[in-house]
Amino acid sequence: DLIGFHGQTILHKPQSKYSIQLGDSKLLSRVTNTIVISNFRENDIINGGQGAPLTPIYHQFILKKIQSKLPSAMINIGGIANITYMEESNKIIGFDSGPGNYLIDEWMRSKTDKEFDSGGLIAKSGHPNEGILNKFLSNPYYKKKFPKTLDVKDLNSQNLNTLNLEDGCATLSMLTVKTICLALGSFKNPPKLILLSGGGRKNKYILD
């Protein structure tokens, strides 16, 4: 047995060649009496990678196991949304498409006593603000070619202060949808199968 431990990222700057995580892998190994493998992000950056996302290898395993038609894609909608695209050669490409749940959750916490928009129901009762949405989408990150990664500290919801709860949720949820669509549109051959994972897969507004 062994433990793969990636820690909790507090700062991620691959362009500056560093990524910092909380967590003591040596202590975890002593406490559990188990071999612990860690520093995935740091080692990937040292070897020329972006240090994120970490999920593509697992996604590749899943797509192979179900013998999906290729090319195919798996979208993980966590705090940040990331996409794994598997080509017909089984080669994989992985990158962050944009915000997933992070901005929505931050908005909910700032306006309510809830941690998230359960099922996307609040977003479904609102309307996205196109002007504010376009300001978000003007971020050059979304036109940048992969490989690329996002740090949550690069995201903020300050442009939403004029909106009510429902419209803010709808705007941020639509931002997640739009940036995923932009990422999928960057592939020459569209995926024949798309699988969803992460908490965002339960958000009916995003799915619709």
Where are these predicted regions, by residue range?
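Conserved ATP-utilizing enzyme core subdomain
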Residues: N90-C181
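Glycine-rich phosphate-binding loops at beta-strand->alpha-helix junctions
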Residues: I10, P191-D208
